[in-house]
Amino acid sequence: MKINAALAKEKNCPLVIEEIEIDEPKDDEVLIRIVASGICHTDAESIKGNGTPFPAVLGHEGSGIIERVGSNVTHLTVGDHVVLSYSYCNSCSQCLTGHHNLCMRTIELNFGGKLQDQTYRLHKDGQNYSTFFGQSSFATYAVANKHNVVKVDHDVDLRLLGPLGCGIQTGSGTVMNSLKPEPGSSIAIYGAGAVGLSAVMAANILGLKNIIVVDIHENRLELAKELGATHTLNSQNLNVVEEVKKITDGGVHYAIETTGVPVVIKNGIDSLRVAGKISIVGMGGDVTLNFTNDILMEGKTIVGTIQGDSTPQLHIPKIIQYYKEGKFPFDKLLKFYDFNDINQAFEDSKTGLTIKPVVIIGS
């Protein structure tokens, strides 16, 4: 079947929309007509060469409508509205204990370029194209394993929902599934991008007393207030650690670091109170710590969190319900782009002009 896809042909090059071939879905797979796809930092990192092998079709925050189902797929049917999330095997020790985000085959299934049976689905002129996160949603159609797919209600605009598959799931899930803060506790969120602002909305739902957001962009800090932040700090103008400790009388109970910037990670750790806990979400470099002084003597906990410790089939419907109730207005983070403008969408995300770009691919 011929489809149009945004092709990543080599490192650090713009995506090119061209016609390619997609195979029919196999027994455990479905064919989805893509309506829209969010653009995530991980897509941008892959263009730099830090992801799946080239040539590839990227995109891992897809939403669309099922057009065909494999013979082993019983919980999905033609016409279902779906969100596509990360790929997992559902049979390893991590998956069987509910930790699908820590699947033992995570790297292979999401970044290896092949689907679960270790074959390709995308081709052009006799050359195989890598699949990304088991979906490759920067295309008019995608073939994905049934475990990638989350069925959603028909009464919410599909164009909104793709980003729930990664960035928004990561931010909200880190609060709700990983840190699980108590009502009345405090949290500092470093970085007011899509992940950080999703964490703000989740913290607000859970009834935290102090929700402190740190960023360098005033417009994003203003949006953070609108979404539920009780305090915002511009780290270009303030000693963040001192300010957080003033606000909370000694430090926050919890923190989330979304930027990956080493100095910001250190600030996040230092802003914790005794026995505080920080979740590291952003991809970054080395951080120098004195574990005796920074961690041991104050009983602090550092945890790495992937995909918000979320099982997509459980977490995404919950977030959609909060959206319907007006408690999680994630649509305020989104800006829509035509599929042909996908490279501009990447640029606007890089410069900070857009928090969460979404490319409209179909209808």
Task: Give the positions of each predicted feature.
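C-terminal hydrophobic helical "lid"/dimerization subdomain
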Residues: 1, 238, 262, 266-270, ...
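Adenosine-nucleotide cofactor-binding segment
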Residues: 189-192, 197, 201-267
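Rossmann-fold dehydrogenase core element
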Residues: 277-279, 290-332
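NAD(P)H dinucleotide-binding glycine-rich loop of Rossmann-like/cofactor-binding domains
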Residues: 22, 93-190
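Residues in the short beta-alpha loop(s) of Rossmann-like NAD(P)-binding domains
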Residues: 217, 284, 308
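Glycine-rich beta-strand-centered segment in the early N-terminal region that forms part
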Residues: 23-37, 47-96, 101, 150-156
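Short glycine-centered segments of the SAM/dcSAM-binding site in methyltransferase folds
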Residues: 81, 186, 276-277, 301
